[in-house]
Curated annotation (Swiss-Prot):
Keywords in alphabetical order: Chloroplast, mRNA processing, Plastid, RNA-binding, tRNA processing
Signal peptide boundaries: none
Family according to the record: Belongs to the intron maturase 2 family. MatK subfamily.
Keyword DNA repair appears in the UniProt entry: no
GO molecular function: RNA binding
Biological process terms in GO annotation: mRNA processing; RNA splicing; tRNA processing
Name of the molecule in the record: Maturase K
PANTHER family on file: MATURASE K
Location of the protein in the cell: Plastid, Chloroplast
InterPro entries on file: Domain_X, Maturase_MatK, Maturase_MatK_N
Main subcellular location: plastid
The keyword Disulfide bond belongs to this UniProt entry's keyword annotation: no
Described function: Usually encoded in the trnK tRNA gene intron. Probably assists in splicing its own and other chloroplast group II introns.
Length: 508
C-alpha cells in the first residue's frame, strides 16, 4: 500500500473520478509488472523475450491517445481497432494497467474501512485459510445438513463491467475498459466461448482474477443482504467493506422479484443458524434445521445466478447432504463427518448404570493418494509411493540437497499438521527422507546401504522428524507429556493465506 500511495498523490474523496488518466501513466504499468521506475533496465529495450520495456509502453500509450474510441462501428471495425499489432501482447500490458488501477482503489477503500472498524488484527487472522477448519470443528456438533456449492463461471464480461460501474463513478475509465474487452473478447456474440475465456484468463491473469473475485464478492453481498433480512438475529460475522452506489435500492428490487417464490417462505422459517464458507470457486452452506430451508437457499442461488448474472446453473450441481454421512475434499484436506459413540459408566448408591453418548465429529484427514501423485509428478517417488532419487540435484552440495528436502518437508508438515490422523503425514516424511538419502547416494555414486554405513548413523537426516518438535518446544513447555499431546493433537497455523500444490513442493 505504501508503494501505491507513493505514486498516487490523489485526494481520497475524489479518487474515483480520476481513474481514467491513470491508464495513460507509465508508472502504473511499472507497478503492474513489478519494475522499479528508477532502474535503467526498465528504460532499455532488453530483447524480444522480456518485452516489458518503457519504450514499448510509451508507444502503446501514444497509439491509445491517437485513436478515436468514441464511436464503435461494425463497418470500419478493422480501421479503428483498439489492439492492432500484437493482440495478445498489447492486451497483457493494458489489462495489467487496468488491474493495478482498480486494485489500488479497492485496496484503499478496504484499508480505510478496516481502520474505521478497528478489526485489523482479527482480520489478519481470519485471512488464513486454516481459520476455516477450527470454525468447522467448533460448529460441527450443532450442524445437521451441509450443501456443497460450485460457483458457476464464466459469465459475460459486459455484465461484470455494468456491475463494476455501481462501485466506481469514472465513466471514461469504463468506456475504455469496455472498448478493450469488446475488441479482445469479441463481444459481438451473445455467448462468449469458454475457449476465449480460457485464453483471456491465461494471458491476463491478474485482471482475470480481479474480475472473478469481484463477481464472487458481488453475489455474496446480495446473499448476505437477504440473509440478514430473513433472520431474527443481527448478523455479526459479515461486514460490507465498500460504500456502494444504489446498493439498497438494487437489493430491494431483488427482494421484490423473489417475494412470491422465496422471501415470504423464508419469513416463516426464521433461522439464524446458517453458516457460509467459501474459498476459490467452492462454497459450503451448513444449517442445523430441516433440509427444506436448505432447499430454499439452493434455489435462491440458482435464481440469483440466472436472473442477476445471466449464468445458467443446474439444480443438480448443488447437493444437500446430512453432515454425519457426508465426506468431501476442501483446501487440500479430506473432511469426513461421522458419529462418535461413547459409553460412560455411572453409579448411584448401590446401583450402576451405563450412559450411551453420541457426539458428532468431523475427521480432517490428509489425502495421501493426491499427495503421492503430486510427489510422483515432481519425481520424488513413483505412483506407488516408492521413493526415487533426484539426479537433477546431484550437482548441488550435500548441504543444499538436504536443505531443499527439508524445506519441502517443512511446507507439507506446516500445512497438514492439523490432520486428525498423523499416520499419512509420517508416510510423506518417510518418502522425502528416503528420496533425500537416495539422491545423496546417487551423487556419491554409492548404494543407499553403503552410503548409510559410511555415515555411521542416520543422525544427519533426523531433522526430518525433529525440526518440527524443536519449533513447537519454543511455544509450549518441553515436557514428554506435552510433546506427546502435541503430536497427537491438531495444530492450525494462521499464517497460511493460500493453497497451491506447486508451492507445497517448492524448494525456493
Amino acid at each position: 500500500m505504501e508503494e501505491y500511495q507513493l505514486y498516487l498523490e490523489l485526494d481520497r474523496s475524489r479518487q474515483q473520478d480520476f481513474l481514467y488518466p491513470l491508464v495513460f501513466h507509465e508508472y502504473v504499468y511499472g507497478l503492474a509488472y513489478s519494475h522499479d521506475l528508477n532502474r535503467s533496465i526498465f528504460v532499455e529495450n532488453i530483447g524480444y523475450d522480456n518485452k516489458y520495456s518503457l519504450l514499448i509502453v510509451k508507444r502503446l500509450i501514444t497509439r491509445m491517445y491517437r485513436q478515436n474510441h468514441l464511436i464503435i462501428s461494425a463497418n470500419d471495425s478493422n480501421k479503428n481497432r483498439f489492439l492492432r499489432y500484437n493482440k495478445n501482447f498489447d492486451s497483457q500490458i493494458i489489462s495489467g494497467g487496468f488491474a493495478i488501477v482498480v486494485e489500488i482503489l479497492f485496496s484503499l477503500q478496504l484499508s480505510s474501512s478496516l481502520e474505521e472498524a478497528e478489526i485489523i488484527k482479527s482480520y489478519k487472522n481470519l485471512r488464513s485459510i486454516h481459520s476455516i477448519f477450527p470454525f468447522f470443528e467448533d460448529k460441527v456438533t450443532y450442524l445437521n445438513y451441509i450443501s456443497d456449492i460450485q460457483v458457476p463461471y464464466p459469465i459475460h464480461l459486459e455484465i461484470l463491467v455494468q456491475i463494476l460501474r455501481y462501485w466506481v463513478k469514472d465513466a471514461p475509465f469504463f468506456h475504455l475498459l469496455r472498448l478493450f474487452l469488446y475488441d479482445y473478447c469479441n463481444w459481438n456474440s451473445i455467448i462468449i466461448p469458454k475457449k476465449s475465456i480460457y485464453t483471456f484468463s491465461k494471458n491476463n491473469t491478474r485482471f482475470f482474477f480481479f474480475l472473478y473475485n469481484f463477481y464472487v464478492c458481488e453475489y455474496e453481498s446480495i446473499f448476505f443482504f437477504l440473509r440478514t433480512q430473513s433472520s431474527h438475529l443481527r448478523l455479526k460475522s459479515f461486514r460490507f467493506f465498500f460504500e456502494r452506489i444504489f446498493f439498497y435500492a438494487k437489493k430491494g428490487h431483488l427482494v421484490e422479484v423473489f417475494v412470491k417464490d422465496f422471501f415470504s417462505t423464508l419469513t416463516f422459517f426464521k433461522d439464524p443458524f446458517i453458516h457460509y464458507v467459501r474459498y476459490q470457486g467452492k462454497s459450503i452452506l451448513a444449517s442445523k434445521n430441516l433440509p427444506i430451508l436448505m432447499n430454499k437457499w439452493k434455489y435462491y442461488f440458482i435464481h440469483l445466478w440466472q436472473c442477476y448474472f445471466d449464468v445458467w446453473s443446474q439444480p443438480g450441481t448443488i447437493h444437500i447432504n446430512q453432515l454425519s454421512e457426508y465426506s468431501f475434499h476442501f483446501l487440500g484436506y479430506f473432511l469426513k463427518g461421522g458419529l462418535k459413540h461413547s459409553v460412560v459408566r455411572g453409579q448411584m448408591l448401590q446401583k450402576g448404570f451405563l450412559i450411551k453418548i453420541i457426539i458428532k465429529k468431523l475427521d480432517i484427514i490428509v489425502p495421501i493418494i493426491p499427495i503421492i501423485r503430486l510427489l510422483a509428478k515432481a519425481k520424488f517417488c513413483n505412483v506407488l509411493g516408492n521413493p526415487l532419487s533426484k539426479p537433477s540435484w546431484a550437482d548441488l552440495s550435500d548441504f543444499d540437497i538436504i536443505a531443499r528436502f527439508l524445506r519441502i518437508c517443512r511446507n507439507l508438515s506446516h500445512y497438514y499438521n492439523g490432520s486428525s490422523k498423523k499416520k499419512s503425514l509420517y508416510r510423506i516424511k518417510y518418502i522425502l527422507r528416503l528420496s533425500c538419502i537416495k539422491t545423496l547416494a546417487c551423487k556419491h555414486k554409492s548404494t543407499v546401504r553403503a552410503f548409510l554405513k559410511r555415515l555411521g548413523s542416520e543422525e544427519l537426516l533426523e531433522e526430518f522428524f525433529t525440526e518440527e518438535e524443536e519449533i513447537l518446544s519454543l511455544i509450549f513447555p518441553r515436557t514428554p507429556s506435552t510433546l506427546r499431546r502435541l503430536h497427537r493433537n491438531r495444530i492450525w497455523y494462521l499464517d497460511i493465506f493460500f493453497s497451491n500444490d506447486n508451492d507445497l513442493i517448492n524448494h525456493d
